[in-house]
Amino acid sequence: MGISYSVEADPDTTAKAMLRERQMSFKHSKAIAREIKGKTAGEAVDYLEAVIEGDQPVPFKQHNSGVGHKSKVDGWDAGRYPEKASKAFLDLLENAVGNADHQGFDGEAMTIKHVAAHKVGEQQGRKPRAMGRASAWNSPQVDVELILEEPEVED
């Protein structure tokens, strides 16, 4: 049994990649996925590198209570710079572009047809407290799937 994606993809025109059980914020993953969908792989890589450097914020359209306003967010007010999740998405994009190149496509020019983050659980952890107690200190785990599609050629 192979890995299943949440959408069907034509293997003749698409390339796929997936992150499994990566320890990062699900909320950050959702915000990044919403922002890079529809961009080319090259544009998405440039965007994520700018997020990591702190030049371009990711708009937080959900779960944005207490999130500060950023002037560089286009069409929205609240935003942050989720560095850890952005690095994971860069790894995913690098993998997807490599898969596309291996299949004979131009990976950098392909558009992101589908990207979705799925919360899959938590890795259990404990944090020692006073008086010999311990509190749960769990890390969320996220699966991310990405499908690149060849751009349509206009006649």
From Swiss-Prot:
What are the annotated GO cellular component locations?
Answer: cytosolic large ribosomal subunit
What CDD domains would the database entry show? Ribosomal_L22
Origin: domain of life: Archaea
Q: Which Pfam families match?
A: Ribosomal_L22
Q: Give GO terms for biological process.
A: cytoplasmic translation
What keywords tag this UniProt record?
Ribonucleoprotein, Ribosomal protein, RNA-binding, rRNA-binding
Which range is the signal sequence, renumbered to this chain?
none
Q: Which PROSITE patterns match?
A: RIBOSOMAL_L22
Mind listing the GO molecular function terms for this protein?
A: rRNA binding; structural constituent of ribosome
Q: Which family does it belong to?
A: Belongs to the universal ribosomal protein uL22 family.
According to its UniProt entry, the function of this protein is described as: This protein binds specifically to 23S rRNA. It makes multiple contacts with different domains of the 23S rRNA in the assembled 50S subunit and ribosome.
How is this protein organized at the quaternary level? Part of the 50S ribosomal subunit. Contacts the macrolide antibiotic tylosin in the polypeptide exit tunnel.
Descriptive protein name:
Large ribosomal subunit protein uL22
What's the source species' lineage?
A: Archaea, Methanobacteriati, Methanobacteriota, Stenosarchaea group, Halobacteria
Q: Which gene encodes it?
A: rpl22
